[in-house]
């Protein structure tokens, strides 16, 4: 009789362990599926927001009224530096343009604008805009300021509002690329 009770108790313990392992696995699988679903929903929402931002960016380029704030700057020798978007930007509004650079976290201590960079303000001319099959938008224009004139090329990445601006001064080879939104 003791053997039968012992075997019954042993079977009961083994059975409860198997059941517990199965329910734990089911809980883990349910958590994993919920996480995957949440991640897919988040990606879908981000894609929708990016497409709305992309359309707004294209409309701003078409209207000739936009500001591109740079997060980083790439110099002609390939050195990249993160910069403040408050003081590094390209702006166009109703035929007037401003290009401002300020490298406060880099080597330049003195500059014409007092911020460690250059500010060009002037008239915008020669605007051209085209879009390729991938949705990338190419926007080019010239800017003529008091002391400096430059050619500006903007590439708006398809499906997002992320852009790259290449500034090519007409009287020097100091090309500068700014990346931002």
Model-derived features with residue positions:
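Helix-rich interaction surfaces within compact, conserved domain-sized segments
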Residues: 29, 125-181
